């Protein structure tokens, strides 16, 4: 059944998985394997998770984490303001966090609402950032240096390194954490593939961010 209220008009059926990134702490059994893989580290931003997709007929659909939303919803209006709907082609989906005033206490103190794209899909297959449509990388979550944030040492070492991360979105403001997106063409063990699913990513949350914001 559809939840009452809001602008939900149907179930989530975009050509992608629902956004999800397990915490690294739940993947300790795969840490040695993860350290052999190439991954793009990106800043995790705290907003409202939204998916925009184009079906085979060229119709654009917008979704919250679990539901399709009305085409007049504020999520769609913001996506259109940034012309994300014009960047898609049939069978494609873009996933982004909507951030700014009035959303999640606007902890990054952004001056206006905006999207931060974190994943793009074509026919249920997540694609690397260098394959994204023109214009979309300009609206992406910040990418961090792959060498500086290479997966090394122990899980605890990595968690400690992320603790206190700040200033990658808004000067001097604590960042929520880091999400590592595995490059698409790598072979994963069956166990790790099952843990990550088609999203093929995982996160470390910044403990200082949680503490400061009472989360």
Kindly label every feature range from the protein language model.
Residues 1-215:
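Core nucleotide-handling region used for phosphoryl-transfer chemistry
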């Amino acid at each position: 059944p559809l939840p009452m209220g809001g602008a939900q008009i149907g179930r989530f059926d975009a050509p992608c998985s629902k956004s999800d990134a397990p915490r690294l702490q739940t993947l300790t059994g795969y840490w040695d394997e993860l350290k052999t893989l190439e991954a793009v580290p990106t800043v995790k931003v705290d907003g409202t998770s939204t998916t925009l997709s184009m079906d085979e007929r060229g119709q654009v659909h917008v979704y919250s984490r679990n539901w399709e939303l009305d085409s007049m919803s504020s999520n769609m209006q913001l996506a259109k303001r940034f012309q994300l709907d014009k960047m898609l082609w049939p069978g494609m989906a873009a996933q982004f966090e909507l951030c700014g005033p009035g959303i999640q206490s606007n902890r990054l103190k952004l001056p206006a609402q905006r999207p931060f794209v974190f994943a793009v899909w074509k026919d249920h297959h997540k694609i690397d950032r260098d394959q994204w449509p023109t214009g979309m990388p300009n609206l992406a979550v910040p990418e961090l240096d792959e060498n500086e944030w290479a997966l090394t040492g122990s899980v605890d070492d990595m968690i400690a390194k992320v603790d206190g991360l700040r200033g990658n979105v808004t000067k001097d403001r604590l960042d929520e954490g880091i999400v590592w997106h595995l490059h698409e063409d790598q072979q994963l063990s069956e166990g790790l593939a099952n843990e990550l699913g088609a999203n093929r990513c995982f996160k470390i949350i910044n403990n200082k961010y949680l503490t400061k914001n009472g989360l």
